[in-house]
Every structure is written in C-alpha cells, then in structure tokens.
Amino acid sequence: MRSMNLVDLWAQQACLVFNQTLSYKSFNGFMKIPLKNSKINPKLNKKRPFSPLTVSAIATTKEDERIEAAQTEEPFNFKIYVTEKAISVNKALDEAIIVKEPHVIHEAMRYSLLAGGKRVRPMLCLAACELVGGNQENAMAAACAVEMIHTMSLIHDDLPCMDNDDLRRGKPTNHKIYGEDVAVLAGDSLLAFAFEHIVNSTAGVTPSRIVGAVAELAKSIGTEGLVAGQVADIKCTGNASVSLETLEFIHVHKTAALLESSVVLGAILGGGTNVEVEKLRRFARCIGLLFQVVDDILDVTKSSEELGKTAGKDLVVDKTTYPKLLGLEKAKEFAAELNREAKQQLEGFDSRKAAPLIALADYIAYRDN
C-alpha cells in the first residue's frame, strides 16, 4: 500500500494549512495569596474605595497576565492529535474483531477494516465526545462501530453489481481477494457486529444514552440515510438532467449521514445537552457534504496513484457530480462556503476543546486524497 502512513500524510497536509498549530485564547482566574509573617496596622486594614488609577493598574496587570498565559500555553498540534487517535482507534478495531471460525469471513472483515484509511469518522466521534465533556473511553466503541459500517459501505460499493471497483485504499478490493459471495457476507457481518459492539463495549455511559446512540446510527444508514442516498445515486446515474437539489439529497444521505451520525454519537455518549447535540449535528452535516464535494473535485483532478482508488470513475459512468453541475471553480467555492458554515456551528464551545473539530473540518476541505 502506497500510504507512507496515511496518518502521517494526513497530518502533514493539515499542518501545511495550519502552519502546524492552532492557537487559542485562555482565561486565568484570580488567586488570593496570603501574606505570611506580616504585621498589619489595624488602621491601615480598613476597607477603602479604590481610586480610578488603582483600578486601572489592577486591570492592566490582570490583562497582561492573561496575555502572557495565552502566549505560553502549548498550542494544539494536529499531527500529534491525529497520530494518537489513529493508534487508539486502530488498536481498538484490531481487538474488536479477531480471527475465529469460520476463518474466511473474519479474515475478509479484517482485510478491509484494517486496510488503512483516514479514520475521519472515528476521530470525529471521539472529538465530539470530548468537546461536550466526555472522555475517549465513552465513545471508543461507537467510533469503531461507525468505521465498521463505513467499511461495509465500501465493500458493497465496490462490488460488480454496484460501482465495480478493483482498487480501494491502494489495495485490491475485498471481492477481488475473497470473491463476491464472501465480500457481501463480510459487509453484512460488519454491519451487524457494529451494533453489537456499541451495546456490549460502551463504557461509563447510561443505558438511555446508549439506546439513543444505537437509534441514531441505525437511522443514518437505513432508508432515511445511507441507503436512501445510494438508491437515488443509482437511479440518477446516466441521467443528464439531475438537478443540484437532487444531487444534494444524494450526498446528504449517502455520504453526510454517516459523518453526521459519527459526530452526534460522540456528543450523545459524551453527555452533551440537546442544544449541544443539535449544534454539532449542523456542523457535521456541513462537513459531510463538504467531504463529498471535495471527493468529486479530487476525482477529476488527481490520479489513481494519488487517490489510492480508481480516479475518473464518475466521468466514465456519467455520474452527476458537483464539478459537472457547477464547474470546477464553483465547486471549490461551494466547498469553502460549507467549511465556513461548519465552523460557525462551533462558536460558543470551549475553543481548546473545539480545536480538533476545526482542524478536522479544514483537513476535509484541503485533503489531497
């Protein structure tokens, strides 16, 4: 596989956008420090009003302290964040599905699940959980589940009866290694196990929130989510009169729904309020559509070697894409608009905790594969 390490590549690209760091503002509280071994004249200990000059001096001092603290605080490092999260997610995925009887189906599941990939969905899930006050353990099972379902969708999407692709993540597709029959079953098994894994392996979360997360995930991949988008996409292939509204329906459901669910699951399992969950839902819907717009752009501007999958396939099968409807430059402008709108939804959250989601949105916008 070409991926020099996809995580390193991803981080390097993101760091070019951010100059490797993101800064935040921080606010320090005031501490009262008692004077030890000091004798105070009672007459001088009487409360007296502050003069305007004294108040101004104190305010200036505290402002200087805040500025100094902000300058000395360690900035967010996206490369470190991505590397650490990817290691954690890959370890959890490896441990979740082990090879047992029947060997061939578990090997096929692991082949595609552990074949690399950017792990965007798991990272979004974990980042959203931590943003609302949860910890990684609360959402790790869900993060693995969304990656299992994403992998299922790729296995099925690559089948001869669908997109008929031979290359995925720089390697032969699942059906090229294990045959169409086993590939279908491997995808089915990943889908079923994803829900089992959330229920059995989620730690430190109330049952009601786990049930809510399961319902959210199920909805995102059924006839109100991924399946709806996939069916609409199939019906529109080869149709020269597909409208922009129809194209948006396809991608909001086919691509954005699972990305949206990844973020919402993290927010639910992290203990987020209804208001926080809905703000993050809007954020995720924007970056989900952004992901597809960028995908369409890359399909016509990059090679198969650069993408790790077959390039130019959309043009060959006459599939409607954003560059086809809008033109390449307008598609790029639309991507930038979606990125801006996504970030607006994060206003009001703690800036330090929101930094990973801001960085992930920028990665999606500026990625090269």
UniProtKB/Swiss-Prot annotation:
Binding site for isopentenyl diphosphate: 118, 121, 150, 169
Protein name: Geranylgeranyl pyrophosphate synthase, chloroplastic
Necessary cofactors: Mg(2+)
Biological process annotations from GO: carotenoid biosynthetic process; farnesyl diphosphate biosynthetic process; geranyl diphosphate biosynthetic process; geranylgeranyl diphosphate biosynthetic process; isoprenoid metabolic process
An example Gene Ontology molecular-function term: (2E,6E)-farnesyl diphosphate synthase activity
Bilayer-spanning residue ranges: none
Cofactor note: Binds 2 Mg(2+) ions per subunit.
Keywords per UniProt: Carotenoid biosynthesis, Chloroplast, Isoprene biosynthesis, Magnesium, Metal-binding, Plastid, Transferase, Transit peptide
Lineage: Eukaryota, Viridiplantae, Streptophyta, Embryophyta, Tracheophyta
Similarity comment: Belongs to the FPP/GGPP synthase family.
A Pfam family assignment: polyprenyl_synt
Cross-referenced InterPro entries: Isoprenoid_synthase_dom_sf, Polyprenyl_synt, Polyprenyl_synt_CS, Prenyl_diphosphate_synthase
Residues holding Mg(2+) 2: 157, 163
Source species: Capsicum annuum (Capsicum pepper)
Function noted in UniProt: Catalyzes the trans-addition of the three molecules of IPP onto DMAPP to form geranylgeranyl pyrophosphate.
Compartment annotation: Plastid, Chloroplast
Coiled coil (residue ranges): none
Positions that bind dimethylallyl diphosphate: 168, 254-255, 292, 309, 319
Catalysed conversion reaction: isopentenyl diphosphate + dimethylallyl diphosphate = (2E)-geranyl diphosphate + diphosphate; isopentenyl diphosphate + (2E)-geranyl diphosphate = (2E,6E)-farnesyl diphosphate + diphosphate; isopentenyl diphosphate + (2E,6E)-farnesyl diphosphate = (2E,6E,10E)-geranylgeranyl diphosphate + diphosphate
UniProt pathway: Isoprenoid biosynthesis; farnesyl diphosphate biosynthesis; farnesyl diphosphate from geranyl diphosphate and isopentenyl diphosphate: step 1/1; Isoprenoid biosynthesis; geranyl diphosphate biosynthesis; geranyl diphosphate from dimethylallyl diphosphate and isopentenyl diphosphate: step 1/1; Isoprenoid biosynthesis; geranylgeranyl diphosphate biosynthesis; geranylgeranyl diphosphate from farnesyl diphosphate and isopentenyl diphosphate: step 1/1
